[in-house]
């Protein structure tokens, strides 16, 4: 049975059981505590934990999931994978254990010919929680023999969130693969033979004081009990397809086979090759799905995970002997099978493939240069008797050659050496400072999100947003937080977070910055609002300072948004929609939005594109945007169900979380239509003007447009006009002649600088006879040092070689000349053959000097070069070379 068929049967079965079929959410989780959607229940957490009312009583889905915790084990075992799909059925206060057990048994054991999954009932086992007699009896009633029902403890069969909230026992269903796979005795005896295929979680208790997974207090029964189940689609697929693991199912095997074909290796012949092919098969599919959900390669967050997946796959192919680009062969193979369930992969494949291929090309260049450096470092480490690469080596690989530390660790393990990871981390910390905190955590001041979830649970209803209709309104203070702790009141001068029962303030989201304004109580206390966040869905947190009076929880207030700021941000947001549409018209439908920021008077629009955009195209985009502004198109918003919105042509942004009801913002009826929760102008003409100030690449497959909007754009153009007028007066040219005139001036300036450098170099080289005439004797070695002052590195090398030749080969000689090139100190050292015979090497001397200069360097025994940061240390560096020569000759170093 094909994987897509299992998926279809699952959804059809539960739809017949009156479940709402919910499309898969994005792999990029909307939960700020998660990077990815790691389980089928993640999109339903707000409903399962009663943060917000569920829009349906019953739901079913096949959810895309990604886990990378055990990425290093992928391919080495047949259990580990990164991307997987989780079938789930959910009940929100509707049916409970009896129906959940009955549904599971019916779907599993109904013959394939009758629409079921056709598992042999005699090969099914279940586990229940130790004290869950009810679940035990329900399994007996559907026909499961008592001897195939095993009771297990909290560690295996009790679910909780890790914090106070809902929890309850669970029941797991296993399939017996037979004696060839292990010992008899059920799941407790051997989980290689008895494979878990379905987990039923019975959320029936309110837990308190959760200390660990197995140590918690049960406060009582939940008023409304929920069901959350999960079935691994790939796991069921390999059982139904008669193969041994997920790598061999129909949705994964084609990539594995293509890797074997490209490499000329046979899967199943050599264990190391099998591991690499499985890595390729898994990671290519994961990369396909991540890029499909809008992720682009980057150096942090989800982008870094994607980059790592692509690079691990590319490197695995190189280890299989494939030197040419492999993704153009592998990615289409994955798309062909995955598009049966996710048809958008086919329609979006031009964009997806462009992003993936660009990342492979970039990494292949990195591998070519970096691998040689890595192998040299390993050889030198082993030759010196070491067992671990230094932190400095690992850092150099990362900083200079683009090797991520995980790749260095992986390659080092394969080469049989360790890595000084703490040393690497320390150097990284020095370079980049403290790592950026998660954006949500920064916005909430580092306060634990559990505090906000608890605050929301205490409210009688989620906060109502009224800001679409009005920029002011009456409300009441529900909660006052100070330092993450609820307080009954807050005096003047206090920084607080305030929750109102309703608010006109827009919380930062969807690329739009938060509203500012004031909240005034009937007694005259005033909160100056400087930020508004929605840390958990349904909770608006107003951050600010009490400027007068005392805020008291429960007080009636008048909330007023800064209307000027709101209008300016709204103009920027509408401008972003205009730019998005025009970019797609000029660059194609694959140039979709990847991010944005809408601030007062300015906008930033990130979009997906692998090609550089010509300047005249950017100017055309700006011109068309302003044409649409002056067309005075109507801007309207309507709320509708998600499916209708998408069918109407509205664009949904990858990675965004949408509910069943969505807000659609349209410009000019059907000209631009996007799912959007932000605020906008009433017409395009109210935007005023858009002036694009930059268009640039921000990474592989992504570009950015930055623009000024409205009055800020007018001010910018006014300043530009004044600047042009000033330039025309200075260079005595008309505006249209400025580029040629300034270009000619720059050419003349460059020629003059070259001539000055030539003359200065001649002066430096003319010093060679004088410098060579003043050697210092260091225990029989002639040492010449000289500080040349401002000079080019090329002239330094020429001078050093000239002086060395003048000293001859009869006696051991060392020449060291330093200078300052482009504001940085440079040192060049040369030795003759006799000096090298005495053990004096140029590379060793340069490293000594460079350390004094605060830098590094190296080279050959006869000629080496280094540099640093501090020009004032040049005399000390040269003296250090003299001293080191003496120490080397006398044997003290």
Curated annotation (Swiss-Prot):
Chain positions covered by the region annotation Disordered: 853-872
Catalytic activity field: tRNA(Ala) + L-alanine + ATP = L-alanyl-tRNA(Ala) + AMP + diphosphate
Keywords: Aminoacyl-tRNA synthetase, ATP-binding, Cytoplasm, Ligase, Metal-binding, Nucleotide-binding, Protein biosynthesis, RNA-binding, tRNA-binding, Zinc
Gene Ontology biological process terms in this record: alanyl-tRNA aminoacylation
Cofactor note: Binds 1 zinc ion per subunit.
The protein's required cofactors: Zn(2+)
This enzyme's EC code(s): 6.1.1.7
GO cellular component: cytosol
Subcellular location per the Swiss-Prot or TrEMBL entry: Cytoplasm
Ion transport found in the keyword field: no
Protein family (similarity comment): Belongs to the class-II aminoacyl-tRNA synthetase family.
The protein's role, per its UniProt record: Catalyzes the attachment of alanine to tRNA(Ala) in a two-step reaction: alanine is first activated by ATP to form Ala-AMP and then transferred to the acceptor end of tRNA(Ala). Also edits incorrectly charged Ser-tRNA(Ala) and Gly-tRNA(Ala) via its editing domain.
Protein name: Alanine--tRNA ligase
């Amino acid at each position: 049975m094909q994987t897509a068929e299992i998926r279809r049967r699952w959804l059809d079965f539960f739809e017949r059981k009156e479940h709402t079929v919910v499309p898969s959410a994005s792999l990029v989780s909307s939960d700020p505590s998660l990077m990815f959607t790691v389980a089928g229940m993640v999109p339903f957490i707000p409903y399962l934990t009663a943060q917000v009312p569920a829009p349906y009583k019953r739901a079913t889905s096949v959810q895309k999931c990604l886990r990378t915790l055990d990425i290093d084990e992928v391919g080495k075992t047949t259990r580990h994978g990164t991307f997987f799909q989780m079938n789930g059925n959910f009940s929100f206060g509707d049916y409970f254990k009896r129906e959940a057990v009955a549904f599971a048994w019916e779907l599993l054991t109904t013959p394939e010919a009758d629409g079921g999954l056709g598992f042999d009932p005699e090969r099914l086992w279940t586990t229940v929680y130790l004290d869950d007699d009810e679940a035990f009896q329900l399994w007996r009633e559907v026909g499961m023999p008592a001897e195939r029902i095993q009771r297990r403890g909290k560690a295996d069969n009790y679910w909780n969130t890790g914090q106070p909230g809902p929890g309850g026992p669970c029941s797991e269903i296993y399939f017996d693969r037979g004696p060839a796979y292990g010992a008899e005795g059920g799941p407790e005896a051997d989980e290689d033979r008895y494979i878990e295929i379905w987990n039923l979680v019975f959320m029936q208790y309110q837990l308190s004081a959760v200390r660990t997974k197995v140590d918690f207090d049960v406060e009582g029964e939940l008023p409304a009990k929920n069901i959350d189940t999960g079935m691994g689609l790939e796991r069921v697929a390999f059982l139904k397809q008669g193969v041994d693991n997920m790598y061999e199912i129909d949705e994964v095997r084609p990539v594995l086979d293509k890797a074997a074909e490209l490499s000329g290796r046979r899967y199943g012949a050599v264990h190391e090759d099998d591991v690499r092919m499985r890595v390729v098969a898994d990671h290519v599919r994961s990369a396909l799905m991540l890029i499909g959900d809008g992720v682009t390669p980057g150096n942090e967050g989800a982008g870094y995970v994607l980059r790592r997946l692509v690079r691990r796959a590319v490197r695995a192919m190189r280890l299989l002997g494939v030197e040419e680009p492999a993704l153009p062969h592998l990615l289409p193979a994955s798309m062909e099978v995955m598009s049966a369930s996710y048809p958008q992969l086919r329609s979006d494949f031009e964009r997806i493939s462009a992003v993936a291929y660009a990342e492979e090309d970039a990494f292949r260049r990195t591998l070519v240069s970096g691998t040689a450096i890595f192998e040299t470092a390993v050889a030198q480490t082993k030759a010196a008797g070491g067992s671990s690469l230094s932190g400095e080596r690992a850092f150099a690989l990362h900083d200079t050659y683009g090797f991520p530390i995980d790749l260095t660790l992986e390659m080092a393990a394969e080469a049989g050496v360790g890595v000084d990871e703490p040393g690497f981390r320390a150097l990284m910390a020095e370079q980049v400072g403290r790592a950026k905190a998660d954006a949500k955590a920064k916005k909430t001041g580092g306060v634990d999100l559990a505090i906000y979830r608890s605050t929301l649970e205490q409210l009688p209803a989620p906060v109502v947003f009224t800001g679409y209709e009005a920029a002011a309104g009456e409300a009441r203070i529900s909660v006052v937080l100070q330092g993450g702790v609820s307080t009954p009141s807050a005096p003047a001068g206090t920084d607080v977070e305030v929750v109102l029962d309703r608010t006109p303030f827009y919380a930062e989201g969807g690329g739009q910055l938060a509203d500012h304004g004031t909240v005034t109580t009937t007694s005259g206390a005033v909160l100056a609002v400087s930020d508004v966040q929605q840390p958990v869905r349904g909770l608006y947190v107003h951050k600010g300072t009490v400027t007068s009076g005392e805020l008291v929880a429960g007080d009636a207030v008048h909330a007023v948004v800064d209307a000027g700021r709101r209008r300016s941000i709204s103009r920027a947001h509408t401008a972003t929609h205009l730019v998005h549409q025009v970019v797609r018209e000029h660059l194609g439908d694959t140039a979709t939005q990847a991010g944005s920021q809408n601030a007062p008077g300015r906008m930033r629009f990130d979009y997906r594109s692998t090609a550089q955009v010509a300047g005249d195209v950017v100017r055309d985009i700006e011109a068309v945007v302003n044409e649409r502004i002056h067309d005075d198109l109507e801007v309207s918003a309507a709320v509708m169900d998600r499916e209708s919105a998408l069918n109407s042509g509205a664009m949904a942004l990858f990675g965004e979380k949408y509910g069943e009801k969505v807000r659609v913002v349209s410009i000019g009826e059907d000209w631009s239509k996007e799912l959007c929760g932000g605020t906008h102008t009433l017409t395009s003409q109210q935007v005023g003007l858009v002036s694009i100030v930059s268009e640039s690449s921000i990474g592989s497959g992504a570009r950015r447009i930055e623009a000024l909007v409205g009055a800020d754009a007018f001010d910018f153009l006014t300043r530009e006009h004044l600047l042009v007028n000033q330039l025309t007066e200075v260079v005595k040219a008309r505006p249209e002649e400025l580029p040629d005139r300034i270009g000619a001036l720059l050419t003349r300036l460059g020629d003059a600088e070259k001539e000055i450098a030539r003359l200065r170099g001649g002066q430096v080289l003319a010093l060679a006879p004088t410098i060579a005439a003043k050697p210092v004797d260091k225990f029989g070695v002639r040492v010449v040092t000289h500080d040349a002052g401002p000079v080019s590195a090329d002239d330094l090398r020429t001078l050093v070689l000239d002086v060395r030749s003048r000293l001859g080969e009869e006696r051991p000689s060392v020449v060291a000349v330093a200078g300052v090139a482009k504001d940085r100190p440079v040192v060049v050292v040369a030795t003759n053959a006799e000096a090298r015979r005495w053990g004096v090497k140029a590379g060793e001397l340069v490293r000594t000097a460079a350390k004094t200069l605060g830098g590094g360097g190296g080279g050959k025994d006869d000629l080496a070069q280094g540099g640093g940061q501090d020009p004032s240390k040049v005399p000390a560096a040269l003296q250090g070379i003299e001293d080191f020569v003496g120490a080397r000759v006398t044997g003290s170093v």
